[in-house]
Amino acid sequence: MAQKRIDPKGLDLKERVVNINRVAKVVKGGKRLKFSAIVVVGDENGHVGAGHGKAAEIPDAIRKAIEDAKKHLIEVPIVGTTIPHEAIGDFGASKVLIKPAPEGTGVIAGGAVRAVCELAGIKDIRTKSLGSNNPANVVHATIEALKQLRRPEEVARIRGKTLEEILK
C-alpha cells in the first residue's frame, strides 16, 4: 500500500539527532573523512519521520538528515495515549516489537526507539529491540512497525465487520 505524502510545512516539527558517526573513504592519498547523521523528526501529534545525511561537517550532515526525514514522514494512528495494537518491524538485522500500554506507563523504550515514539506523540508504549542494535536499523525497524498500525475503524472496514465485532 502506497503511503500518501505528508506536507511538512503545515506541521510544527521537532527534531532529535539519534546518531552521529565519523565515516571514512579510503582513497589513493589517504582517508577522506565525512560525518554521517541520523535524525528523527516529529510533531508529537501522530507524524514522524527518519532521515540520514552525510557531509564533511557535522552541522551540514544534520541539516541534510533533517531534510531527508521531512521527505519520509508517516502518519501514526494513536488511540488515547498509546497505539491500537502490537506490531513487529524488521529492518536489516534489527527487529523492534511495539506493544500498547495502559495510561500512565510512559515510554518504555531504548535510545533510538524512544526518540521515534516520543516524537510520534505516543505517551504510553512498551517496546523491545531484538537483534542488531545499530541505531540506523533500529530507527528504520521502529518506523516499519509504526507503518503496520491500523485504527480499529480501518480494520473493521477492511474485514467488512462492525466496529463492535472488532473490539470485542
Curated annotation (Swiss-Prot):
Top-level division of the source organism's lineage: Bacteria
Disulfide topology: none
Molecular-function annotations in GO: rRNA binding; structural constituent of ribosome
Domain S5 DRBM: 13-76
Record InterPro entries: Ribosomal_Su5_D2-typ_SF, Ribosomal_uS5, Ribosomal_uS5_bac-type, Ribosomal_uS5_C, Ribosomal_uS5_N, Ribosomal_uS5_N_CS, Ribsml_uS5_D2-typ_fold_subgr
GO biological process: translation
Entry's family note: Belongs to the universal ribosomal protein uS5 family.
Domain comment, as recorded: The N-terminal domain interacts with the head of the 30S subunit; the C-terminal domain interacts with the body and contacts protein S4. The interaction surface between S4 and S5 is involved in control of translational fidelity.
NCBIfam families, per database record: rpsE_bact
Name this protein carries in UniProt: Small ribosomal subunit protein uS5
Species in which this protein is naturally found: Caldicellulosiruptor bescii (strain ATCC BAA-1888 / DSM 6725 / KCTC 15123 / Z-1320)
Lineage: Bacteria, Bacillati, Bacillota, Bacillota incertae sedis, Caldicellulosiruptorales
